[in-house]
A protein has these predicted regions:
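Conserved cytosolic catalytic loops of P-type ATPases
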Residues: 28-50, 205-208, 237-331, 429-472, ...
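Conserved cytosolic catalytic headpiece of P-type ATPases
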Residues: 1, 36-38, 302-309, 315, ...
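Conserved ATP-binding TGD loop and adjacent catalytic N/P-domain core of P-type ATPases
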Residues: 1-2, 18, 516-518, 552, ...
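Actuator/coupling domain of P-type ATPases
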Residues: 55, 61-70, 75-80, 134, ...
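Signature of the cytosolic headpiece of P-type E1-E2 ATPases
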Residues: 103, 200, 483, 492-603, ...
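Flexible metal-binding regulatory segments at protein termini and peripheral loops
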Residues: 1-133, 156, 229, 254-255, ...
Length: 753
């Protein structure tokens, strides 16, 4: 299967995107197509052996829309084309100004005669009715020309059997203009045949002002909507702007500045104080304080030195270093983040599919309601003038856009808000599902704990602490075990001189033996001491105490004499307890799963306050724990970082990977926490709840608006209350509904997580 991003032009509302999706998804060989109305693009997955891009594009063009394969930029991540968007905004602004000028003229002339506003005498009085009508028509024609897109797209879609919002506007405005023309011919007939008694009926039904002002108001709404929608992708634009345009490279002993696109893997790059890191890499010389706030949300600079990884787009606030480029273009962390965010905003949440389905039937239903309403009023004895007013009002007040925009705008803004806080959401489905989570499973190592053992206790017997630590490190420095590495690191941190060990031997599951200064020495657990016939009876209380604290005690022997004990532990992250408390305060049950023994698991459970600890769990058992909870009816989020967490992450309703984890875990997850901070789990779920609340608000008001507005426009309340909606007010209301939905979604940018 091949995935392709297509740019699509000519879409005006959700009926358009729904139509494209429906038709393309029916094509043989197409597995899935998801159209993003906000970004005018579509992600399509298809079988190349059956269908290709050309066939898909041709099918879209047959529907009356433009389509082309998206041209990826230097970052090789699918991103909004800002230049195209800016150009479209500029063109729309010109259309808006022209529409308002000429629509304003026809509106002033029409309403001025009714309300006594100052007007030239040659259009006043019964004898000048025809001149007045012709002048209004003259002002109206430029508006029709300026906003001809509504007619071109609307009529084309209407004739193809896929009417959209443009179709409603085209029919409403076009019917008004045609009725105005009919009135002009009627007035000409009245003057030509001296039937001045017919003039008032025609003069009161010109409708040129309705035709022009409807188009102008819709254009105002579209412009405001486009401006608001441009802010929905601010997070992606901000990420795109992080990438520097150039890099300072050192090749063959010479330094020079080159475009970042020319950097290749293995290049040595120089990053001075205040400069941005061009691509991903590792420091090979020097050090710096890296500002990673734009990617992780972490406000304080992070100190980096030789061997540390650096991320392209971060800023070196102080220091000077050389780095080796390890990832460029689409392989950089920043490009992957942009791609993840873009793909998430292009995916559809299940709740969006309901709105899309409704939108697909909405426009034909509205046209039917307009025709039926007009026919009913004619049958009740109303005039053609009244019936036409009803039909036009119904057409222009209905707004499929409000329904279509309700979900994608909230998803896009919410996903961007998450990215700004270091929470990458890979799909809209995950964002929707997360708000229903009632159970959170946390892996222990690397998630609750730091994942890197450290020395916690040094308990010497007959020697000093430093002597014991140096002796232990000398024994362990050839070991590849994480516990041994922790002891060596502690000794090196104190700059202790380590003795040289000989005849080194590793005993699996017990420890190591070696010769130091001619003496037989050993380091290991209680089992090793028992094998060496060292008396352990006095050590049991100490062992139990350390184990109950989640620590692993290691004992050190020289020439059969016990020198002391060093305890090593994978320490709990500073924010883990607070994060678990916040999840519980949000009404969630929190479990910890680990492959560690029961004593260690219980010690960590007591320390951080999880509701339950499941110990000695194999990788496949973690997935089974998730499945069991799901079978009990729980919505489960799994948080982990390792390869052994991948099956459980994939099985969970929402898989959340710690950003410092393995690529496999990140690939299997639905969300990625860049900062590797458990507090962000609560933030992600809180964000999901806020987004879903926003979507429901948008859908509620969009449905209410149409449910109330359409009957009002159809004249349902006219007989009882005398309420009749003017087409101009209907057009204004329609524009406001779309703008209000987008504006409400933009509030998500400022929520506190």
């Amino acid at each position: 299967m091949k995935k392709q991003l297509l740019d699509i032009t000519g879409m005006s509302c959700s009926a358009c995107s729904s139509r494209i999706e429906k038709v393309v998804n029916r094509m043989q060989g197409v597995e899935q197509m998801s159209v993003n109305l906000l970004k005018n693009n579509a992600h399509v997955t298809f079988d190349e052996s059956i269908v290709d891009e050309k066939a898909i594009i041709a099918r879209i063009e047959k529907l009356g829309f433009g389509a082309r394969v998206h041209a990826a930029g230097a970052a090789a991540a699918p991103v909004p084309q800002q230049d195209t968007a800016a150009q479209e905004m500029a063109e729309m602004k010109q259309r808006l100004i022209g529409s308002l000028i000429f629509a304003g003229l026809v509106f002033y002339q029409h309403m001025g005669r009714m309300w006594g506003w100052p007007l030239p005498s040659f259009i006043l009085g019964q004898e000048n009715e025809l001149i007045n009508a012709l002048l209004q028509m003259l002002w109206c024609i430029p508006v029709l020309f300026i906003d001809r897109k509504y007619f071109i797209h609307g009529v084309r879609n209407l004739l193809s059997g896929a009417p959209n919002m443009d179709s409603l506007i085209a029919v409403g405005s076009g019917a008004s203009f045609i009725y105005g023309l009919y009135s002009v011919f009627g007035m000409a007939y009245a003057f030509g045949h001296n039937r001045l008694d017919l003039l008032p009926g025609f003069a009161d039904a010109l409708y040129f002002e309705a035709s022009a002002v409807i188009l102008a108001l819709v254009t105002v709404g579209k412009f405001m909507e486009a401006r608001a929608k441009s802010h929905t992708s601010d997070a992606i634009k901000a990420l795109m702007n992080l990438t520097p345009k150039t890099a300072l490279v050192e090749r063959h002993g010479l330094q020079g500045e080159i475009p970042v696109e020319e950097v290749v893997t293995g290049d040595v790059l120089i990053v001075k104080s205040g400069a941005s890191v061009p691509v991903d890499g590792k420091i090979i010389e020097g050090s710096g304080a890296l500002d990673e706030s734009a990617l992780t949300g972490e406000s304080l600079p992070v100190d980096k030195t030789i061997g540390d990884k650096v991320i392209g787009g971060t800023i070196n606030r102080s220091g000077y270093f050389k780095m080796e480029a390890t990832a460029i273009g689409a392989d950089t962390a920043l490009a992957k983040i942009i791609a993840l965010v873009d793909e998430a905003t292009s995916s559809k949440a299940p709740i969006a599919k309901l709105a899309d389905k409704v939108s697909g039937y909405f426009v034909p239903a509205v046209i039917g309601i307009a025709v039926i309403a007009a026919d009913v009023w004619l049958a009740l004895g109303a005039s053609w003038h009244f019936a036409l007013t009803i039909a036009i009002s119904v057409l222009v007040i209905s707004c499929p856009c409000a329904l279509g925009l309700a979900t994608p705008t909230a998803i896009m803004v919410g996903t961007g808000r998450g990215a700004k806080s270091g929470i990458l959401i890979k799909s809209a489905t995950a964002l929707e599902t997360a708000h229903k989570v009632d159970t959170v499973i946390l892996d222990k190592t690397g998630t609750i704990t730091s994942g890197k053992p450290v020395v916690t206790d040094i308990l010497p017997i007959k020697v000093t602490e430093n002597e014991l630590l140096a002796f232990a490190a000398g024994l362990e420095k050839l070991s590849e075990h994480p516990l041994g590495e922790a002891i060596v690191a502690a000794a090196e941190a104190k700059q202790l001189a380590l003795p040289e060990a000989g005849n080194y031997k590793q005993i699996p599951g017990q420890g190591v033996t070696a010769e130091l200064a001619g003496a037989e020495c050993a380091a290991g657990n209680l089992k090793l001491l028992q094998e060496l016939n060292v008396d352990t009876s006095t050590l049991m209380d100490q062992y139990d105490k350390l184990a109950s604290q989640g620590k692993t005690p290691l004992y050190f022997v020289r020439a059969g004499e016990l020198l002391g004990c060093i305890a090593v532990a994978d320490t709990v992250k500073p924010t883990s307890k607070e994060a678990i408390g916040k999840l519980q305060a949000m009404g969630m049950r929190v479990l910890m799963v680990t492959g560690d023994n029961r004593a260690t698991a219980e010690a960590i459970r007591a320390q951080v306050g999880v509701d339950e600890a499941v110990a000695q769990v194999l990788p496949q058992d973690k997935e089974a724990v998730v499945r069991k909870l799901q079978q009990e009816g729980h919505i489960v989020a799994m948080v982990g970082d390792g390869i052994n967490d991948a099956p459980a992450l994939a099985r969970a309703d929402v898989g959340i990977a710690i950003g410092a984890g393995t690529d496999i875990a990140i690939e299997a997850a639905d969300m990625v926490l860049i900062k590797s901070d458990l507090l962000d789990v609560a933030k992600a779920i809180r964000l999901s709840r806020s987004v879903m609340t926003n979507i429901k608000e948008n859908l509620f008001w969009a449905f209410i608006y149409n449910a109330v507005g359409i009957p009002f426009a159809a004249g349902v309340f006219y007989t009882a209350f005398g309420w009749l909606l003017n087409p101009l007010i209907a057009a204004a209301a329609m524009s406001c509904s779309s703008v209000s939905v987008v504006t409400n979604a933009l509030r998500l940018r400022f929520i506190k997580l």
